[in-house]
Amino acid sequence: MAKNIQAIRGMNDYLPGETAIWQRIEGTLKNVLGSYGYSEIRLPIVEQTPLFKRAIGEVTDVVEKEMYTFEDRNGDSLTLRPEGTAGCVRAGIEHGLLYNQEQRLWYIGPMFRHERPQKGRYRQFHQLGCEVFGLQGPDIDAELIMLTARWWRALGISEHVTLELNSIGSLEARANYRDALVAFLEQHKEKLDEDCKRRMYTNPLRVLDSKNPEVQALLNDAPVLGDYLDEESREHFAGLCKLLESAGIAYTVNQRLVRGLDYYNRTVFEWVTNSLGSQGTVCAGGRYDGLVEQLGGRATPAVGFAMGLERLVLLVQAVNPEFKADPVVDIYLVASGADTQSAAMALAERLRDELPGVKLMTNHGGGNFKKQFARADKWGARVAVVLGESEVANGTAVVKDLRSGEQTAVAQDSVAAHLRTLLG
């Protein structure tokens, strides 16, 4: 017997019982995006490796440890995308979408990072990202955050997520802060773990993200990034906070929030939860006004965010069990008796024409009425349409409400209208 081939560790199959809730959540997200005027862009999952090295930063964990990089048959270095922003910017530059234009874009799809798989963190994971180009004021930053807050309300999880904000200022302000932070860390080098010692010179702001309790205690006395901000960044952040307060969106300023990718400036934010254990970040983003120019385009202000769908699904299931997947089937067509199958299939096609959007499944594989009604129940159907030999002969069908048990004989020409009333 041949040996079974299994999925790669950290790259999961999502089976029909799971994808139904994903589809409902994704549909909710897309409806909100449409209400804000955002347009979908579809991007390759493989890009040239230098794109990510240049965009994300060569001394980040993503580039150093986590990327799936390989050489193709032409000798080119390619990488499975670890995030979506770099590819979106590349596409915008390549297709002339960005210079002197406003763009509000979103994308959805799989990303890849070689991490230790655990609940809410996988090697293949799915993100929905939004990117806005050509707008530099705090109002668009606020709109993106308002959009995410509307998602949480639609999904019934608002009480379980908290917004954290910070401003990391301009490149020059961060350079000044970097020098002060390195000087502080050098004075306390003996209290740093090996990872922080390495980061201290390559990417010192990442030390602020350390989960080591001793390092966190040390950082209580470290210089604060907010003290080094340039005046424009201060004004931008104050404007953002004022807009969020006007919109009734609560937030906490987290001076240690810096984000893990090098391209950010000014606004950074995260929506976090206490309901998923250690994997607390649900959605995160910020400004990256220098990235378009860094990747070969003309200077273009930009802001965006990404959200991990695996974590979002886990959170919705954990805190809002009333948010159910849509039923697989609305109507189940039961047929029993000689020569009823062709009549049943013809009626099913007519109903699909007359009731667009309604999910109708026809029984196949035979079985008596009891077995067929059991199948209807298994698929979650609300209504059964029954054809037996007498119904075929009379040009009628029996429509049965599977919740109340009530049933009515209806002329086949009137079945669609009757179903429309039953299904609302």
UniProtKB/Swiss-Prot annotation:
The superkingdom of the source organism is Bacteria
The keyword 4Fe-4S is annotated on this UniProt entry = no
Q: GO CC annotation: what is one? A: cytoplasm
Q: Which EC numbers does the record give?
A: 6.1.1.21
**GO biological process: what's one of them?**
histidyl-tRNA aminoacylation
Q: Which InterPro entries match?
A: aa-tRNA-synth_II, aa-tRNA-synth_II/BPL/LPL, Anticodon-bd, Anticodon-bd_dom_sf, His-tRNA-ligase, HisRS-like_core, HisRS/HisZ, HisRS_anticodon
| Alphabetic keyword roster | Aminoacyl-tRNA synthetase, ATP-binding, Cytoplasm, Ligase, Nucleotide-binding, Protein biosynthesis
Record keywords: Aminoacyl-tRNA synthetase included? yes
| Pfam families given in the database record | HGTP_anticodon (PF03129), tRNA-synt_His (PF13393)
Intracellular or extracellular location(s): Cytoplasm
Query: Where does the UniProt entry say this protein principally localizes?
Result: cytoplasm
Q: Which GO terms describe its molecular function?
A: ATP binding; histidine-tRNA ligase activity
Catalytic activity of the protein: tRNA(His) + L-histidine + ATP = L-histidyl-tRNA(His) + AMP + diphosphate + H(+)
Q: Kindly give the SUPFAM superfamilies that the UniProt entry links to this protein.
A: Class II aaRS ABD-related (SSF52954), Class II aaRS and biotin synthetases (SSF55681)
Query: Would you identify the family this protein belongs to, as annotated?
Result: Belongs to the class-II aminoacyl-tRNA synthetase family.
Q: How does it assemble?
A: Homodimer.
**What name has this protein been given in UniProt?**
Histidine--tRNA ligase
